[in-house]
Amino acid sequence: MKIPSSEMEWKMIARDFGEKYQFWNCLGALDGKHVAIQKPRLSGSLYYNYKGYFSIVLMALANARKEFIMIDVGANGRVSDGGVLFYTKFWELYQQRSLFLPQPGTLPSTSDIFPFVFIGDEAFALGENLMKPYPQYACNNEQKTFNYRLSRARSVVECAFGILRTKFGVFQKNINFEPSKAALIVATSCYLHNYLIKTSRKQYLTSSWKVETQSSEQLLDLEPTNNRNPSRDAKMIRQKFCHYFNNEGKLL
């Protein structure tokens, strides 16, 4: 799969999120999952994750159509969960400012300027281009509204993972291959997922994906991170979105 390589491509993704989920200027929903594998030979505890089993990590960015627009798979399960993102090609391109992200722009019903952002859950660190929920234990009503709007838009990546889990039998038990082969199997499944959405969308997505799998260890969430002292600008941007969702951008 190809990461968007122009502002126009990113803006098309953002338009879909705005029209479908009313989260404007959103460039994609980010999430990561543990994929259970057999213990690799001579690896010690390298792939042993916080849940107590061996895994590799699948990191993915999804668009509003439930397609993967970026995947990175193969990091060992022992890596600090929130830190997996920093080892991906996606993050490398972001740090190098090579993603060709759109310049900040206005949202409907306001002349204020907002950056384009990615959205994630508690496993990720808040950043100027990465929004995450406010901590649940200390939310006021406006912050709860922000969390709801973010969760609503971010559901696309959870849904994409849910479809993978149900449609591909490989995700219903441990993958009994070495990490490199397991990563190839996982990546191939993600490519097939995208292909089927494009060519047989209605048939592929019609059947319910909310079916419990045989293994509770497959595609489990990453561990939430502790507060990483986000920058003042990142906090202000989240607060700006929060204010918008409770005022000009309020759902009617």
Indicate where each model-derived feature is located.
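Short, polybasic Lys/Arg-rich linear motifs in disordered N-terminal/cytosolic regions
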Residues: 1-252
